[in-house]
Regions:
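P-loop NTPase motor domains
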Residues: 7-237, 241
Length: 247
Protein backbone atom coordinates (compact mmCIF):
# COMPACT_ATOMS: atom_id res chain seq x y z
CA UNK A 1 0.00 0.00 0.00
CA UNK A 2 1.45 3.34 -1.07
CA UNK A 3 0.26 6.77 0.02
CA UNK A 4 1.00 9.04 -2.94
CA UNK A 5 1.38 12.67 -1.89
CA UNK A 6 2.73 14.13 -5.14
CA UNK A 7 0.91 11.96 -7.67
CA UNK A 8 4.16 10.56 -9.08
CA UNK A 9 3.79 6.92 -7.98
CA UNK A 10 1.01 6.04 -10.41
CA UNK A 11 3.53 5.60 -13.22
CA UNK A 12 4.48 2.13 -12.01
CA UNK A 13 1.40 0.74 -13.75
CA UNK A 14 3.26 1.26 -17.06
CA UNK A 15 6.76 0.12 -18.13
CA UNK A 16 9.54 2.63 -17.63
CA UNK A 17 11.32 4.40 -20.48
CA UNK A 18 15.05 4.08 -20.96
CA UNK A 19 17.25 7.16 -20.73
CA UNK A 20 20.89 8.12 -20.36
CA UNK A 21 20.41 8.78 -16.66
CA UNK A 22 18.75 5.39 -16.15
CA UNK A 23 21.60 3.63 -17.97
CA UNK A 24 24.07 5.25 -15.58
CA UNK A 25 22.09 4.00 -12.59
CA UNK A 26 21.75 0.51 -14.07
CA UNK A 27 25.53 0.32 -14.52
CA UNK A 28 26.27 1.88 -11.12
CA UNK A 29 24.26 -0.73 -9.23
CA UNK A 30 25.07 -3.67 -11.51
CA UNK A 31 21.44 -4.21 -12.39
CA UNK A 32 22.10 -5.46 -15.92
CA UNK A 33 23.74 -8.59 -14.51
CA UNK A 34 20.58 -9.22 -12.46
CA UNK A 35 18.39 -9.26 -15.56
CA UNK A 36 16.95 -5.76 -15.12
CA UNK A 37 14.21 -4.78 -17.53
CA UNK A 38 11.38 -2.29 -17.68
CA UNK A 39 7.94 -3.66 -16.88
CA UNK A 40 4.69 -2.58 -15.31
CA UNK A 41 3.22 -3.67 -11.97
CA UNK A 42 -0.39 -4.54 -11.10
CA UNK A 43 -1.77 -1.39 -9.50
CA UNK A 44 -5.10 -0.47 -7.94
CA UNK A 45 -5.86 3.21 -7.44
CA UNK A 46 -7.83 4.57 -4.48
CA UNK A 47 -9.06 8.04 -3.55
CA UNK A 48 -11.19 8.96 -0.54
CA UNK A 49 -12.91 11.62 -2.65
CA UNK A 50 -13.43 9.26 -5.60
CA UNK A 51 -11.84 11.63 -8.13
CA UNK A 52 -8.61 9.80 -9.00
CA UNK A 53 -9.46 6.21 -8.11
CA UNK A 54 -11.89 3.81 -6.48
CA UNK A 55 -13.64 5.58 -3.57
CA UNK A 56 -11.92 4.49 -0.35
CA UNK A 57 -14.84 4.17 2.04
CA UNK A 58 -15.86 2.67 5.34
CA UNK A 59 -19.03 2.95 7.38
CA UNK A 60 -19.62 4.84 10.61
CA UNK A 61 -20.34 1.52 12.37
CA UNK A 62 -17.08 -0.04 11.15
CA UNK A 63 -15.06 2.98 12.21
CA UNK A 64 -16.53 2.70 15.71
CA UNK A 65 -16.98 5.32 18.45
CA UNK A 66 -13.37 5.32 19.69
CA UNK A 67 -11.71 6.21 16.39
CA UNK A 68 -14.57 8.50 15.43
CA UNK A 69 -14.18 10.43 18.68
CA UNK A 70 -10.46 10.84 17.96
CA UNK A 71 -11.21 11.98 14.42
CA UNK A 72 -13.57 14.68 15.72
CA UNK A 73 -11.29 15.48 18.69
CA UNK A 74 -14.12 15.07 21.22
CA UNK A 75 -13.55 15.55 24.93
CA UNK A 76 -14.04 12.71 27.42
CA UNK A 77 -17.70 13.50 28.13
CA UNK A 78 -18.57 13.78 24.44
CA UNK A 79 -16.66 10.56 23.69
CA UNK A 80 -18.62 8.69 26.37
CA UNK A 81 -21.92 9.95 24.96
CA UNK A 82 -20.89 8.96 21.44
CA UNK A 83 -20.18 5.45 22.75
CA UNK A 84 -23.67 5.40 24.30
CA UNK A 85 -25.18 6.51 20.98
CA UNK A 86 -23.48 3.58 19.25
CA UNK A 87 -24.75 1.24 21.99
CA UNK A 88 -28.32 2.48 21.53
CA UNK A 89 -28.06 1.95 17.77
CA UNK A 90 -26.60 -1.53 18.30
CA UNK A 91 -29.35 -2.50 20.76
CA UNK A 92 -31.91 -1.52 18.13
CA UNK A 93 -30.06 -3.31 15.30
CA UNK A 94 -29.51 -0.02 13.49
CA UNK A 95 -26.50 0.19 11.18
CA UNK A 96 -24.82 3.58 10.97
CA UNK A 97 -23.66 3.76 7.38
CA UNK A 98 -22.86 7.42 6.77
CA UNK A 99 -22.85 10.80 8.48
CA UNK A 100 -26.55 11.27 7.75
CA UNK A 101 -27.30 8.13 9.78
CA UNK A 102 -25.14 9.38 12.63
CA UNK A 103 -26.84 12.80 12.65
CA UNK A 104 -30.26 11.16 12.66
CA UNK A 105 -29.21 8.94 15.57
CA UNK A 106 -27.87 11.90 17.53
CA UNK A 107 -31.12 13.79 16.99
CA UNK A 108 -33.12 10.76 18.14
CA UNK A 109 -31.04 10.46 21.31
CA UNK A 110 -31.36 14.17 22.03
CA UNK A 111 -35.14 14.13 21.59
CA UNK A 112 -35.56 11.01 23.76
CA UNK A 113 -32.81 11.61 26.31
CA UNK A 114 -35.22 11.56 29.27
CA UNK A 115 -36.62 8.14 28.35
CA UNK A 116 -33.18 6.74 27.54
CA UNK A 117 -31.60 7.95 30.79
CA UNK A 118 -33.09 5.11 32.85
CA UNK A 119 -31.20 2.49 30.80
CA UNK A 120 -28.14 4.35 29.55
CA UNK A 121 -27.56 7.10 32.10
CA UNK A 122 -27.80 10.86 31.82
CA UNK A 123 -27.31 12.18 28.29
CA UNK A 124 -26.80 15.93 28.21
CA UNK A 125 -28.45 17.56 25.21
CA UNK A 126 -25.68 20.17 25.12
CA UNK A 127 -23.06 17.44 24.62
CA UNK A 128 -25.14 15.79 21.90
CA UNK A 129 -25.43 19.16 20.15
CA UNK A 130 -21.65 19.62 20.37
CA UNK A 131 -21.09 16.21 18.78
CA UNK A 132 -23.58 17.09 16.05
CA UNK A 133 -21.62 20.27 15.25
CA UNK A 134 -18.44 18.19 14.96
CA UNK A 135 -20.17 15.79 12.57
CA UNK A 136 -21.15 18.72 10.34
CA UNK A 137 -17.53 19.92 10.39
CA UNK A 138 -16.39 16.38 9.56
CA UNK A 139 -18.70 16.32 6.53
CA UNK A 140 -17.18 19.56 5.28
CA UNK A 141 -13.68 18.08 5.65
CA UNK A 142 -14.45 15.10 3.42
CA UNK A 143 -16.24 12.79 5.81
CA UNK A 144 -19.35 12.83 3.65
CA UNK A 145 -17.40 11.06 0.88
CA UNK A 146 -15.38 8.81 3.19
CA UNK A 147 -18.28 7.27 5.09
CA UNK A 148 -20.65 5.18 3.02
CA UNK A 149 -21.03 1.99 1.03
CA UNK A 150 -19.63 -0.07 -0.53
CA UNK A 151 -17.04 -0.20 2.24
CA UNK A 152 -13.46 -1.31 1.61
CA UNK A 153 -12.69 -4.97 2.31
CA UNK A 154 -9.01 -5.06 3.20
CA UNK A 155 -8.86 -8.85 2.88
CA UNK A 156 -9.21 -8.39 -0.90
CA UNK A 157 -5.73 -6.87 -0.92
CA UNK A 158 -4.13 -10.23 -0.18
CA UNK A 159 -5.23 -11.81 -3.46
CA UNK A 160 -2.79 -11.77 -6.37
CA UNK A 161 -3.11 -8.91 -8.77
CA UNK A 162 -2.56 -10.68 -12.10
CA UNK A 163 -2.38 -14.08 -13.78
CA UNK A 164 1.35 -14.42 -13.06
CA UNK A 165 0.72 -14.42 -9.31
CA UNK A 166 2.12 -10.98 -8.56
CA UNK A 167 0.36 -9.12 -5.79
CA UNK A 168 -1.34 -5.78 -6.37
CA UNK A 169 0.15 -2.45 -5.39
CA UNK A 170 -2.62 -0.35 -3.85
CA UNK A 171 -2.00 3.37 -4.36
CA UNK A 172 -3.96 5.99 -2.42
CA UNK A 173 -4.06 9.40 -4.09
CA UNK A 174 -3.34 11.81 -1.24
CA UNK A 175 -2.87 15.06 -3.11
CA UNK A 176 -6.14 16.42 -1.74
CA UNK A 177 -6.32 14.29 1.40
CA UNK A 178 -2.98 15.56 2.72
CA UNK A 179 -4.55 18.97 3.35
CA UNK A 180 -6.69 17.37 6.08
CA UNK A 181 -4.09 15.69 8.27
CA UNK A 182 -6.64 14.49 10.84
CA UNK A 183 -8.72 12.61 8.24
CA UNK A 184 -5.50 11.28 6.66
CA UNK A 185 -4.19 10.05 10.03
CA UNK A 186 -7.50 8.52 11.07
CA UNK A 187 -7.84 6.69 7.75
CA UNK A 188 -4.36 5.25 8.25
CA UNK A 189 -5.17 4.22 11.81
CA UNK A 190 -8.46 2.62 10.73
CA UNK A 191 -6.72 0.53 8.06
CA UNK A 192 -3.98 -0.67 10.41
CA UNK A 193 -6.48 -1.33 13.22
CA UNK A 194 -8.69 -3.38 10.88
CA UNK A 195 -5.72 -5.49 9.80
CA UNK A 196 -4.54 -5.89 13.39
CA UNK A 197 -7.95 -7.13 14.50
CA UNK A 198 -8.54 -9.54 11.60
CA UNK A 199 -5.13 -11.03 10.77
CA UNK A 200 -3.76 -13.99 12.77
CA UNK A 201 -0.51 -13.82 14.72
CA UNK A 202 2.42 -15.04 12.60
CA UNK A 203 5.44 -13.86 14.59
CA UNK A 204 8.60 -12.80 12.73
CA UNK A 205 8.25 -13.69 9.06
CA UNK A 206 11.06 -13.76 6.52
CA UNK A 207 8.95 -11.49 4.36
CA UNK A 208 5.88 -9.50 5.47
CA UNK A 209 2.47 -10.41 4.04
CA UNK A 210 1.78 -6.77 3.34
CA UNK A 211 3.70 -3.52 3.58
CA UNK A 212 2.62 0.10 3.94
CA UNK A 213 4.76 2.92 2.57
CA UNK A 214 3.78 6.43 3.61
CA UNK A 215 5.20 9.20 1.45
CA UNK A 216 5.99 12.41 3.39
CA UNK A 217 5.16 10.57 6.63
CA UNK A 218 5.86 13.62 8.80
CA UNK A 219 2.66 15.16 7.44
CA UNK A 220 0.69 12.38 9.16
CA UNK A 221 1.55 13.82 12.55
CA UNK A 222 1.18 17.49 11.73
CA UNK A 223 -1.53 19.23 13.76
CA UNK A 224 -3.17 16.00 15.02
CA UNK A 225 -4.08 15.41 18.66
CA UNK A 226 -1.66 13.76 21.07
CA UNK A 227 -4.13 10.92 21.68
CA UNK A 228 -4.43 10.13 17.96
CA UNK A 229 -0.65 10.24 17.51
CA UNK A 230 -0.15 7.89 20.44
CA UNK A 231 -2.70 5.42 19.10
CA UNK A 232 -1.01 5.35 15.68
CA UNK A 233 2.39 4.69 17.27
CA UNK A 234 0.94 1.88 19.37
CA UNK A 235 -0.71 0.08 16.43
CA UNK A 236 2.40 0.45 14.23
CA UNK A 237 4.51 -1.29 16.88
CA UNK A 238 2.03 -4.12 17.51
CA UNK A 239 1.08 -4.92 13.92
CA UNK A 240 4.51 -6.35 13.02
CA UNK A 241 3.55 -9.65 14.65
CA UNK A 242 0.66 -9.87 12.17
CA UNK A 243 3.05 -9.91 9.22
CA UNK A 244 2.50 -6.26 8.26
CA UNK A 245 5.37 -3.83 7.74
CA UNK A 246 5.06 -0.05 7.97
CA UNK A 247 7.67 2.22 6.41
Amino acid sequence: FLADIKGDLSGMCRPGVDSEDMQKRIQKFGLAECGFNYHNYPAVFWDIYGDMGIPARTTISEMGPILLAKLMDLNDTQSDILTIVFKIADDRNLLLIDTKDLKAMLQYVSENSAELAAEYGNIAKQSVAAILRNVVALEAAGGEEFFGEPAMNLSDWFFSGDMSGRGSINILDCRQLVHDTTLYSTFLLWMLSELFETLPEVGDMEKPRMVFFFDEAHLLFKDISKALRGKIEQVVKLIRSKGVGVY
